[in-house]
């Protein structure tokens, strides 16, 4: 089947919704590269900072406040003044890495405000994946090998961080339908059904239809959603 040319898909997701799995399947469907935590590695290479710094600040606003209140106070202060190191700078390095990756060909991004960073790029489709709370809790319990209460806490804490991060940098509201081109509840259709629906939406909304150059998807280390 013909596929949209130069497609860029940005996938936002609730924790435990299966969004990362759907993103991988979309990358396979359209022959695109998949960028999840790989963006942190690219940002680290471009900036010269350690990838660990980007990991600790990943979709988490307030990283420096935590450092300054703990044992990392001296480290944080020294790096801030000596390297003009701040959360906003980290976000910009990451945004630059996203823009560079998007310029190199068709790809799928998971989270990290990619939909906002690429808002002026032609062919970008933004999708948000949600799911029923019970299913999300079950998925997190299985992945983390924890009880229901712990899984619920992981979801609530993780989503609070994601929402704060997204809202701050984009000026939009995380998870609000108005912030995306398409919102899908994976509990209604299942992972494969949700993937098929999104793929069909992308094909129908694309102004051109042409086979994408096939690129192997990159393995992801994140299994959080």
Regions found by a protein language model. Give the residues of each.
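RNA pseudouridine synthases
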Residues: 101, 107, 113-121
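Small-molecule kinase domains that catalyze NTP-dependent phosphoryl transfer to phosphate-bearing small molecules
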Residues: 61-73, 147-192
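NTP-dependent small-molecule kinase module
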Residues: 95-99, 168-224
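Pre-Walker A (Motif I) flank of P-loop NTPase domains
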Residues: 4-13, 105
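Short beta-strand-centered segment that lines the nucleotide-binding/catalytic pocket of NTP-utilizing
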Residues: 33-44
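ATP-dependent small-molecule kinase phosphotransfer cores
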Residues: 44-106
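Glycine-rich phosphate-binding P-loop
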Residues: 11-24
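Conserved phosphate-donor/acceptor-positioning beta-strand/loop module used by diverse small-molecule
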Residues: 120-142, 148-157
């Amino acid at each position: 089947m013909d596929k949209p040319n130069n497609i860029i898909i940005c996938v936002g997701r609730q924790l435990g919704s299966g969004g990362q799995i759907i993103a991988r399947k979309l990358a396979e469907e359209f022959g695109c590269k998949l960028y999840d935590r790989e963006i942190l590695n690219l940002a680290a290479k471009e900036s010269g900072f350690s990838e660990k710094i980007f990991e600790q600040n990943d979709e988490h606003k307030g990283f420096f406040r935590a450092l300054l209140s703990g044992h990392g106070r001296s480290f944080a202060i020294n790096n801030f003044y000596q390297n003009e190191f701040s959360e906003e700078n980290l976000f910009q390095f990451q945004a630059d890495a996203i823009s560079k990756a998007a310029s190199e060909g068709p790809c799928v991004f998971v989270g990290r405000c990619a939909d906002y960073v690429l808002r002026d790029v032609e062919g970008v489709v933004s999708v948000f994946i949600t799911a029923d709370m019970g299913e999300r809790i079950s998925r997190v319990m299985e992945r983390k090998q924890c009880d229901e209460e712990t899984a619920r806490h992981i979801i609530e804490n993780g989503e609070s961080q994601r929402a704060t991060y997204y809202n701050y940098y984009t000026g939009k509201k995380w998870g609000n339908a108005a912030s995306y081109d398409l919102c899908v509840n994976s509990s209604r259709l299942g992972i494969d059904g949700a993937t098929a629906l999104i793929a069909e939406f992308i094909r129908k909304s694309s102004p051109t239809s042409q086979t994408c150059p096939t690129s192997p998807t990159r393995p992801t280390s994140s299994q959080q959603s």
